[in-house]
Each structure stands twice: as C-alpha cells, then as structure tokens.
C-alpha cells in the first residue's frame, strides 16, 4: 500500500530511480492488466491487451489489441507470457508512461 494501490510489494530490492516501491516514482491514473509480449529492451516490457469492438455493419465483434510499453523495475523478474498490472505515471521517455506494479500470474516477484 506504499504507492497508493492495492498491490503486493515485490520481495526483491532494487536501486532503480524509476521504481514506484524503492525509488521516487509516483503513480496516478489508470491501472491496466495485460500479457507481456516482449522483453527485448533494457528495463522495458511491451504489454499487450486484447479487447472486442462491435462492428454494426456485420452485427459481430472484432478482436483488437493494444501494445503499451512499460517500465520494468529491477525488483521484478518478468518474462514473456506473464500477466502483469501496469500503472500510469509521468512520461519516462518518448513512448513510456506506464510502470509495472505487480505480476499477477506466471512469474515470481
């Protein structure tokens, strides 16, 4: 509860300035959940979310996806396929405005 969200704190420690638990980064706004699609960048993961959009012409639903780059603090051990929660924060770079706050399934914190 140290960051104002109802998430479990990671067991590991880190010296990352942009960690909401061990650094000085504040979180605000939306909390999203998705699956990690890529961990190829340093300290960054790409979180993919799938959702359905109704198409009135065909009276059916179509699958869409969004890919959100998020900062991955050193205290989390994140791999591809993990389900994570990400929280909105100040812009950390040109594309990153979210940070991983919890691994909800598939990994160890």
Swiss-Prot record:
The record's section on CDD domains has: Ribosomal_uS17 (cd00364)
Q: Which GO terms describe its cellular component?
A: cytosolic small ribosomal subunit
Q: Which GO terms describe its biological process?
A: translation
Q: Name one Pfam family in it.
A: Ribosomal_S17
GO MF annotation terms: rRNA binding; structural constituent of ribosome
Query: Out of the domains of life, which is the source?
Result: Archaea
| Keyword check for Coiled coil | no
Query: Where does the record locate the signal sequence feature?
Result: none
Quaternary data = Part of the 30S ribosomal subunit.
Extract the NCBIfam families matched here.
Answer: PRK08572.1 (NF006345), uS17_arch (TIGR03630)
| Family assignment from sequence similarity | Belongs to the universal ribosomal protein uS17 family.
What does it do?
One of the primary rRNA binding proteins, it binds specifically to the 5'-end of 16S ribosomal RNA.
Q: What is this protein called?
A: Small ribosomal subunit protein uS17
